[in-house]
Amino acid sequence: MVKYPSGSLAAFRKPVTTQKKMRTGKRSYTHKKGVNFSDRGMTLEQQINESNKYYLTEEIAVVHKKPTPIQIVKVDYPKRSKAVIREAYFRQASTTDYNGVYKGYYLDFEAKETKNKTNFPLKNFHEHQIFHLAECLKQQGICFTIIRFASLERYFVTPASFVINAWRKAEKSSMTLKEIESHSYEIKSGFRPTLPYLKAVDNFIADRKRE
């Protein structure tokens, strides 16, 4: 039996800081109407995973989803050479969803989605995720969140620095769609791979080089 956590988090009280403020590229790329990623019947995670398989096969990038840590509680040994897990708990993940290497750059990112049409709730980000992204930014990693507006069928690569700054503001409960449009890189439609997010990442990297 696998038991899911209650969702509670031990508070990280260590301040989330970066060595320097990073200006995000205020550029949004036109969304092509008539393209429906959701018609393919896949979740955002499935779309990213399928795209990552394509990138790996084509030797474009090596990006993997980090496994959720499991705490094993009870194990039976019906045979000497075979162990059966009878009870385990999903532990709280301590970092982000994905990481990898692309064109010599270290990538680290989250995948988030919402059914909202005008804003993205910041409560969808946990403190440990914000802390980890901030630490990776200190090492000059390419850090971001792939945000999906499910009702609008729109996808964005949103730089981590923008997300962190928004999350830190106590009075701010969400990022508006307009804010995300102006600070993010919209993912253009594609067939191979399913979600060609690295094209948006290319624009993100290019803007960072110009800063």
Swiss-Prot record:
Keyword vocabulary terms for this entry: Cytoplasm, DNA damage, DNA recombination, DNA repair, Endonuclease, Hydrolase, Magnesium, Metal-binding, Nuclease
Transmembrane residue ranges: none
Marked site positions, Transition state stabilizer: K112
The organism's place on the tree of life at top rank: Bacteria
EC number: 3.1.21.10
One Pfam family here: RecU
Binding site for Mg(2+): T95, D97, E110, Q129
CDD domains: RecU-like (cd22354)
Keyword Magnesium: yes
GO CC annotations, alphabetized: cytoplasm
Record's catalysed reaction(s): Endonucleolytic cleavage at a junction such as a reciprocal single-stranded crossover between two homologous DNA duplexes (Holliday junction)
Localization of this protein: Cytoplasm
Cofactor note: Binds 1 Mg(2+) ion per subunit.
Keyword DNA repair: yes
Main location: cytoplasm
InterPro entries to which the protein is assigned, alphabetical: Resolv_RecU, Restrct_endonuc-II-like, tRNA_endonuc-like_dom_sf
UniProt record, GO biological process: chromosome segregation; DNA recombination; DNA repair
Cofactor: Mg(2+)
Molecular functions (GO terms): endonuclease activity; magnesium ion binding; nucleic acid binding
Function: Endonuclease that resolves Holliday junction intermediates in genetic recombination. Cleaves mobile four-strand junctions by introducing symmetrical nicks in paired strands. Promotes annealing of linear ssDNA with homologous dsDNA. Required for DNA repair, homologous recombination and chromosome segregation.
Family: Belongs to the RecU family.
Annotated protein name in UniProt: Holliday junction resolvase RecU
Native organism: Lactobacillus acidophilus (strain ATCC 700396 / NCK56 / N2 / NCFM)
Gene for this chain: recU
